[in-house]
Structure formats: C-alpha cells, structure tokens
A protein has these predicted regions:
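Transmembrane helix-bundle core of multi-pass membrane transporters
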Residues: 16, 124, 148, 152-214, ...
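Single transmembrane alpha-helix segments in multi-pass membrane proteins
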Residues: 37-41, 55-107, 143-150, 284-298, ...
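Helix-loop-helix "hairpin" substructures at the membrane interface of multi-pass membrane proteins
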Residues: 123-128, 136-141, 193-268
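Cytosolic-side transmembrane-helix boundaries in multi-pass membrane proteins
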Residues: 1-35, 39, 206, 233, ...
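Inter-helical junctions in multi-pass inner-membrane proteins, predominant
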Residues: 43-61, 167-170, 189-194, 212, ...
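Membrane-interfacial amphipathic/re-entrant helices at transmembrane-helix boundaries
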Residues: 2-71, 108-125, 354
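Alpha-helical transmembrane segments within multi-pass membrane transporters and channels
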Residues: 109-159, 306-307, 311
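Transmembrane alpha-helical segments in multi-pass inner-membrane proteins
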Residues: 247, 253, 264, 268-333
Length: 370
C-alpha cells in the first residue's frame, strides 16, 4: 500500500513539474526520444561494439538532417505565439534558393569584386540577396495579415501557391550548380563530422531565446498573442509587431535555404521544401509554441480566430469557407499548366476575403442585409 502511495506521489510531482517547468518537460521528452531512438538504432548492427561506435554518428546525422526544419520551427514559434500561422515557408525556401543560385551563377567572379570590393567570397552577394528577399517575402505576408486584415491561414496559403508556381515558371527545369566554395558553408568537417548545420541551429536557438525572453519585441509578441486589444491599449503597435514576426520568419527561412543549397549543391524546384511548413508547425507546437497559455492551444484547435475578442466579425468561431475553395480549385481544371494554375489559385485565395467583404458592404448599402 505504501509503495502504491509513494508511486502516486511521485507521478503527481512529475505531473506538476511537467506543467510548471517547460525546461523539465522538454528535457524529459528529449530523454525519451534519445532512449527510443538509441534502441531503434541498435537493431541496425550485428554487435554491441558496432552499435556503440556508430551511435554518435547516427545522432549527428539525425540532427543534421533536421537542422533546417529546426531553424524554421524557431520562427514558427513566434508566429504561433502571436496567434498566426505560416504555410508558405516551404515555397519561400524554394524561391529564396532560386535567387541565391541565380546570383551565384550570374556573378561567378563576384559582383563585389566588380565594384572594387575584394577579399569577399563570390557567393556572398547571393547570400545577402537571399536574406533580403526572404525578409521581403515575409514582410509581404505580414502586411497582408496586419494591414489588410487577411486571416494568416489564407494569406500564407495564397503566398505558398504563388511562390511555388512563379519559381517553377521562372526556373523551369534549369540545372543550376554552385561552386565548391559555397558547399563549404554546410559541408566543412569539424572533428571529422559535418556538424555546421547543427551549430547554426544552436546559435539561432540561443539568439531567439534571448530575443523572446529579454527584449521588448519578445514581450510584445506574447502580449499580442495573449490579447490584441489589451496589447494595443498598453501602447503596443500590434501591426508593427505582426509584420516584424513574419519578416523574422522570412529571414530564418532564408538561412535555411542557404544551408540546404550549400549542403546539396542544387535544388529541386518542384518538390524542395514540400512539407516543411507542417513539420515546422508540429515542432513549434510540441516544443512550446502553444504551451505558454492554454488559450493559445485552444485557438489552434478550436477554429477561433486569433483576434476573435477584438473584432465583431470574429466574435463567433471561424467557419471554413468552402465556397471560396471551389472556384479556386476549379482554376486548375481549366489550365493545362499546373504551375500557372497554382499562381492563379493563390491570387484567388488572397482576394477572396476582400471580395466577400465588398459584396456584403454593397448589400448593406442597398438595404438587402439588415
């Protein structure tokens, strides 16, 4: 009886610790993952010695292969905490990768050298252009969401379709290669192993942890996600914060694009980045994007708009508008080239909300409604 009571007490303590201490819960999950993955990896080798020798290498491979998603998930955490979502990260990564590779191939001797700046790698201009382009794309999403009041789901879904389509149209099947010096960004060995992508991931995690905990911007992100109206009354520029969140997201996607292109040396414009958004969203939620407040999890699962307390039109649960999806899907049926159809579908999704609101407004003006 005493053993059962002690066991229950221990479980209760662990449960309370799990709910109150995010570091403890994260560490427990990671420990469980290590144990399960270690056992699974053990089945691939004939002897314990072979398993032990390759244990570290296997974990390095796992972390290296997930570094890109991990970096994107860091930005997605900010997005989800603020009450938003970003479905365009995969397509954005492909578009940025295309820009990087085009710049590298257009200026193989270095644009900086041409204007008198020496000692800088030829691919530096490509990286800078990629990061700027990523921030620009993130800024566009931020403006659509913060200024145009488009739901984040619709805005980023439209951006996803447009970016994927335009990138495929522009690049076609062009096989663009990058110089070996650029490959060194991710493939340089340290201690006999390729761990640079993991280090980039860790550095980004540390920087963004500091930003979220110890800067006004980090506090404003939590304030906006908790209650937009209260944040606005407290002097927070909600639109600016939302815009900067998506700019940050674009910059992190650009970093991921640099890592991916420099690892592989090429990019599949049709399939690269597919599923990145879902993996990043899942990682952000599991890792803590939705755990700081119960309300954040509720919003993510219940279908309520992130600003449902702030605007009359969002006071009731948001309903998926299937009517807007039907003609958008039909666009693909009347175009043989699916790449062009995706761009048209994305444009339709971005404008559907405004068209619906204009229609309701005109009906109110002529007295059909109310």
């Amino acid at each position: 009886m005493t053993q059962v009571t002690n066991r229950q007490t221990l479980l209760e303590k662990v449960g309370r610790k799990w709910k109150s201490d995010p570091i403890f819960s994260t560490g427990l999950v990671l420990a469980l993952m290590v144990i399960l993955q270690t056992v699974a990896l053990g089945f691939d080798y004939e002897s314990f010695g072979a398993w032990f020798t390759n244990w570290g290498k296997n974990w390095i491979n796992i972390l290296r292969n997930n570094a890109g998603v991990g970096i994107v998930a860091l930005g997605m955490t900010f997005v989800i905490i603020s009450g938003g979502i970003d479905l365009a990260v995969g397509s954005t990564m492909v578009a940025i990768g295309a820009v990087i590779m085009v710049f590298i191939n257009q200026y193989p001797d270095g644009l900086l050298t041409a204007i008198g700046i020496t000692g800088v790698p030829a691919y530096a201009i490509g990286i800078v252009a990629g990061v700027i382009f990523g921030c620009l794309l993130g800024g566009i999403s931020g403006v659509l969401i913060a200024r145009s009041k488009l739901p984040a789901f619709i805005a980023t879904l439209g951006m996803m379709k447009i970016l994927r389509s335009v990138t495929q149209q522009v690049m076609q099947t062009a096989a663009v290669k990058v110089p070996s010096s650029f490959l060194a960004i991710s493939n340089t060995k340290i201690g006999g192993e390729v761990i640079l992508p993991i280090l980039y991931w860790l550095v980004a995690a540390v920087i963004l942890h500091i930003v979220s905990r110890y800067t006004p911007f980090g506090r404003h992100v939590y304030a906006v996600g908790s209650n937009e109206r209260t944040a606005r009354l407290s002097g927070v520029n909600v639109e600016r914060v939302k815009g900067l969140i998506y700019v940050l997201m674009g910059a992190l996607v650009a970093v991921t694009a640099v890592i991916q292109v420099s690892r592989i040396g090429s990019m599949d414009y049709a399939n690269a980045g597919s599923g990145y958004e879902m993996d990043a969203i899942a990682a952000a939620i599991i890792g803590g994007g939705g755990r700081h407040q119960h309300e954040r999890r509720t919003r993510l699962h219940s279908g309520h708009g992130a600003g449902h307390a702030d605007h009359r039109r969002d006071e009731q649960p948001a309903q998926p508008d299937g009517r807007a999806a039907l003609p958008a899907r039909g666009v693909q049926g009347i175009h043989r080239d699916r790449r062009g159809a995706f761009a048209k579908e994305g444009s339709y999704r971005l404008t559907a909300r405004q068209r619906k609101e204009r229609k309701e407004k005109s009906m109110l003006n002529i007295g059909i409604i109310g």
